[in-house]
Amino acid sequence: DYKLTLPMQKYSHLPQLEVGILFSPEICFRLNGIFTCRTTGKKYTGAYNIRQTEDGYLLSQADHREPVSLPLTFEPEDDTTSDFDLTDVVIGIQFHWERKENQKFKGKLKIIDEQKHLTAINILSLEDYLLSVISSEMRATSSAEFLKAHAVISRSWLLAQIDKAKTVRGTYSSYRVDQEEYIRWYDREDHAHFDVCADDHCQRYQGISKAYTPAVREALEATRGEVLTYEGTICDARFSKCCGGATERFDNTWEPVVHPYLD
């Protein structure tokens, strides 16, 4: 037996994230405040829906119909007072608690076409993302040290995925085949057009509709930029909420890569 101590380091560059939220043939949303779309050169506010027709994409508001080209990005003129709502966001995908709910988000709204469906993406800062993740993955009323630990772990996992994507994009395979078995693992590499999704597949992110406490924000500020590292590389810090008192090696659960800190 041995104890592996992982050093924490400050990550100086905290990037903007693109989080996939909603996947549907039609997306209904409400812009609360004034938003600008550079693609159309117009300003928008209020409730809209967008869908594909035989002639292309149609953005609708009440009786107004506007043909548009994708992608569309709606950017708030005032980040502090503006937000947007998405209707019928599916959470707990393929779990027994799967359901739809309406959610509210800060930041930019981007809509793209992924061929099988339209996708709504939230663009926001990493720390604002973590504010919701911590409140969604665990209780926002948990002790301060639990919240700090979760902040460091979630930040480390996310930045490790972003760093990994820079080196494996276009060459990564999430399965292994030999003569006797086919092994498939499900990871964030399944997402080609955004960094992470908002569900349990990556990290649970439910926008600002998920209640959080001042303690969550304090935990983020206290650990701002802190990540776990191993031999100079940010740790792929996997976590679970229900381990049953036992853990498993990383290479027995995901891709066949050995991480000594996840044995």
Where in this protein do the model-derived segments appear?
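Conserved, single-site charged/polar hotspot
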Residues: 1-263
